[in-house]
Amino acid sequence: MSFVARSLIRNVPLMGKAILSQQKQIAARLLHQTAPLAAVRVQQPAPDFKGLAVVDNSFQEVKLEDYRGKYLVLFFYPLDFTFVCPTEIVAFSERIKEFHDINTEVLGVSVDSHFSHLTWCNVDRKNGGVGQLKYPLLSDLTKKISADYDVLLDKEGISLRGTFIIDPNGILRQYSINDLPVGRSVDEVLRLIKAFQFVEQHGEVCPANWNPNSNPATIKPDVEESKKYFSKHG
């Protein structure tokens, strides 16, 4: 057997290990490039984001950090110039004062460009546009934000109707995701924020269907104290 042949045989295991190591490195790089930042979980920090948004008919960079100290309703919708989407977007805009009254901002997101958002904001609502909105629309053209919040439909390349309530410390408190054909309830989003704020301020918990106006009874989270609630509502 020649010297070259013997050398090849001796080095086969080393060559195999080198190839395997290279493959692992490539796989790790691909995973890092394509995977979401982290799983979206209630009680954990909301995934960070930043991008260009339409704010008062101009382009501005918007990032999660901008909303520290306030509650944020971050809601995703599929596309501009569609059917259910303008009804939701306008509904949030028409109720914006109610959100501001409880220290809350609203931010809409889709995979459209900021140019598309701007054009849509300049189409009359009677013609399927959204008109001048009282909160920003953020562009997620790269689809990174939608992927990080786990609402992206990979095949269609659009986002589901995800709604995320983020508290003043950047912690995710609640989220829900609707399938494409059904719009969400602004009333329910407001109710949830008020419930979280009530718990923070008073230390009592909010039962099913709690409402600060029509059904304000709460529960003290104590075995004995909770009996006062259940004796009346059980």
Swiss-Prot record:
One of its GO terms (biological process) is hydrogen peroxide catabolic process. The keyword Transport does not apply. It comes from the Eukaryota. It is an enzyme of class 1 (oxidoreductase). The active site is at C85. SUPFAM superfamilies: Thioredoxin-like (SSF52833). Gene3D superfamilies: Glutaredoxin. It catalyses: a hydroperoxide + [thioredoxin]-dithiol = an alcohol + [thioredoxin]-disulfide + H2O. Its main location: mitochondrion. It is found in: Mitochondrion. Expressed in thoracic flight muscles (at protein level). Detected in the head and body (at protein level). Disruption phenotype: RNAi-mediated knockdown leads to decreased lifespan, increased susceptibility to oxidative stress and an increase in apoptotic cells in the central brain. Exposure of young (10-15 days old) flies to paraquat or hydrogen peroxide leads to decreased resistance to oxidants. Reduced survival rate under oxidative stress conditions; further decrease in responsiveness to oxidative stress with age. Affects coordinated motor behavior, such as shorter distance covered in a given time interval (15% reduction) and reduced velocity (16% reduction) compared to wild-type animals. Pfam families: 1-cysPrx_C (PF10417), AhpC-TSA (PF00578). Residues 40-198 form the Thioredoxin domain. GO terms for molecular function: peroxiredoxin activity; thioredoxin peroxidase activity; thioredoxin-dependent peroxiredoxin activity. Homodimer; disulfide-linked, upon oxidation. 6 homodimers assemble to form a ring-like dodecamer. Also exists as a monomer, however the monomeric form is present at a much lower level than the homodimeric form. The active site is a conserved redox-active cysteine residue, the peroxidatic cysteine (C(P)), which makes the nucleophilic attack on the peroxide substrate. The peroxide oxidizes the C(P)-SH to cysteine sulfenic acid (C(P)-SOH), which then reacts with another cysteine residue, the resolving cysteine (C(R)), to form a disulfide bridge. The disulfide is subsequently reduced by an appropriate electron donor to complete the catalytic cycle. In this typical 2-Cys peroxiredoxin, C(R) is provided by the other dimeric subunit to form an intersubunit disulfide. Thiol-specific peroxidase that catalyzes the reduction of hydrogen peroxide and organic hydroperoxides to water and alcohols, respectively. Plays a role in cell protection against oxidative stress by detoxifying peroxides. May be involved in aging-associated changes in the responsiveness to oxidative stress. Involved in the maintenance of global thiol redox homeostasis. Functions in the central nervous system (CNS) and in motor neurons and is essential for normal motor function. Belongs to the peroxiredoxin family. AhpC/Prx1 subfamily. This is Thioredoxin-dependent peroxide reductase, mitochondrial.
